[in-house]
Amino acid sequence: MQQQSAHEAAQAVVNSIYRLSPGDKDSPLIIDVSRSGTRYPPEFLPPASFRALHTKISPYVDRIVLPSVAEGATVLMAEFPPTLVDPNRPVDDLDPDCLDAEWPSVLKPLQASLASGSGLVHTLGSDYTPLYQGKLSVTDVERRISDYYRPYHHALSELLAKKREKFGRAFQLSCHSMSSIGPKDGVPRPPICLGDLDGMTAPTSYVDLVARVFRGQGFEVAFNKPFRGNELLRRHASQAKRIYSLQVEMRRDLYLDEATRELNAGLATLQKCFLEIAALIRTAPPA
């Protein structure tokens, strides 16, 4: 893991649900990393191979963003993997056919989640092989929600509320990585994709600031395609309350070899981007 500052090492909160690394300086910026966790709970023992499980995460995104604590960003990272339960999915985005009994409330699985097996609880690996041989128990899925999903969202909500109270505004960057080629359509993806639910979760000035930094390092930036954002933006953003949220998807080959997952020199370039973004947000005058 990226070496921590003395302040971060002293103040970091680590448990089975999340790692919270406070910024070294006062800032309204929260960076959340929800899909890079590698702490597999002992009770999570699907029959799928470790590779099938592990290739569903956004690898090393914490390494990319952690240096930004030096410029005041607070980093919240989920310790658990998204294959256990995915914080970036609505709680009703669950395939009823994967359950051993009727769910106690109405489910509304998204078609894209059904096709990819990547809803609230992932059922397919990155190669579309099943992660489970049988049905999931309703009790087990409810426990994943209560023990992991809800506490992560609660922690993020509290952090944003405190920043909003202190600064009059709060900024959320929800950070992920994506494969360089779309697994279904085979279409090459842009280096960086910024999602704001098509303008719903962030003002243009915030989106432009982030895009400008990435472009300054030579990266092409796309907006809302192939990813426009999901539950982490929908649940926490409120422009009326001045809580501004933006999803950042980074193409994995920018910082690692996708076959071996070995990091490359591009890691430092992306770290520099987040340091600059954090510095600009920390020093920006209130809008």
Where are these regions (language model features)?
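N-terminal catalytic or cofactor-binding beta/alpha core of small enzyme domains
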Residues: 2-172, 177-287
